[in-house]
């Protein structure tokens, strides 16, 4: 749940107090660590059972997590990501609007922006997404429909992503207008693997 939305995770942002919450990935900035946190009545159950875990007692990860949390607080990391994400959403939608591409839109919270593509002219979302992704890669951008923006991305990186999206949208729109999408695609069409 956390640190994309707030230091206390999504539950803090949404005003929910969960019985149990899990933190992983970002908590130690790449070091192997995950955390289970929860209400005292549930966490006390660990006193009565034997439990073990792969990285139990691995102190460098614990030190990394403490430093990570310190940096997130001190440098305003969460707000920085939020601002960059909001800029991506605004820029993506502005690009789509300027090209009259009404079948692509960005949405969501700035801390976790997403974009979606509607079916058009008998082509599926995955077919259109394939060409869009291909053109983004040609412009040095590798992302799926959720461009996970992080603290190390600069404002220039976000502008470059928006520019690449706009150029890719123009190519997709040309292919769709010509009803010739598959002639623009170099590889296989993206397949949905998780349903």
Where are these regions (language model features)?
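Conserved N-terminal phosphate-binding loop of PLP-dependent enzymes in the Aspartate aminotransferase
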Residues: 1-195
């Amino acid at each position: 749940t956390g640190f994309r939305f707030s230091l206390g995770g999504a539950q803090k942002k949404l005003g929910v107090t969960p019985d149990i919450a899990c933190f992983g990935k970002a908590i130690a900035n790449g070091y192997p660590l995950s955390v289970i946190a929860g209400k005292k009545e549930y966490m006390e159950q660990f006193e009565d059972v034997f439990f073990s875990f792969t990285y139990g007692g691995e102190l460098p990860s614990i030190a990394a997590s403490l430093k990570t949390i310190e940096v997130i607080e001190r440098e305003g990391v969460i707000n920085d990501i939020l601002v960059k994400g909001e800029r991506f959403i605004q820029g993506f939608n502005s690009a789509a609007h300027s090209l009259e591409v009404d079948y692509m839109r960005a949405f969501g919270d700035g801390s976790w922006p997403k974009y979606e593509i509607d079916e058009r002219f008998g082509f599926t979302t995955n077919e259109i997404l394939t060409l869009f992704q291909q053109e983004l890669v040609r412009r040095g951008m590798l992302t799926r429909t959720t461009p996970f923006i992080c603290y190390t991305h600069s404002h220039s990186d976000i502008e470059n992503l928006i520019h690449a999206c706009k150029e890719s949208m123009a190519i997709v729109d040309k292919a769709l207008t010509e009803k010739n999408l598959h002639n623009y695609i170099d590889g296989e069409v993206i397949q949905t693997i998780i349903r």
